[in-house]
Amino acid sequence: MNFFIKLIVFLFIQGVLQLTIQEAQAKKLTFVRDAETESGIRALITPLLQSAGLDNDSVNIYIVNDPTLNAFVAGGPNIFLHTGLLATSGSASQLIGVLAHEIGHISGGHLSKLAAAQKRASNEALIGTILGGAASFLLGNPSAGSAIMSGGQHVGTRNLLRFSRTQELSADRAAIRYLDASKQSAQGMLNFM
């Protein structure tokens, strides 16, 4: 019985930690507003959005004041570009390649698919935990239970990583299609990524 109490506490703490991590990440973002930069990025992204069949006004661009080399899509059709990415881009074609990749995530519906993949991975880990707890209790062998729990977590993590790699490859392929359709070179994307 003691094991099940620990399990419930563990799952509760995991949920609280996840919320805390998400809140902390959201609060850390500070944005840069610069009309000239935003206008330039919008000019670069417009042909790509047209190639992807997306409405230019439906995609928002945010510049995040962060020196790291990063870009991501979050919260719907929102592209976040770190200032570090903008500073590090050696050419417009490199930035265009990154933008095309992020548009690939949006047009592929990867955010909604990610939520489903995370839920599956969480369920796989939870099933492993429940089976491990049951095995530990029924067999009287905590080591066997721990091994099953670890296996369930490993399966969930591995499947989520596989999903992530698939989505990244899909976004890259879409980016190349959008670059070709808008008559832009993919060389910057290939050099930068």
Predicted regions and their residues:
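N-terminal secretory signal peptides that target proteins for export/translocation
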Residues: 1-4
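Bacterial N-terminal signal peptides
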Residues: 6-18
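Peri-catalytic and regulatory segments of divalent metal-dependent proteins
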Residues: 24-139, 156-163, 169-193
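N-terminal accessory/precursor segments of enzymes
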Residues: 136-149
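Short, conserved phosphate-binding/catalytic loop or strand-edge motifs used
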Residues: 146-155, 193
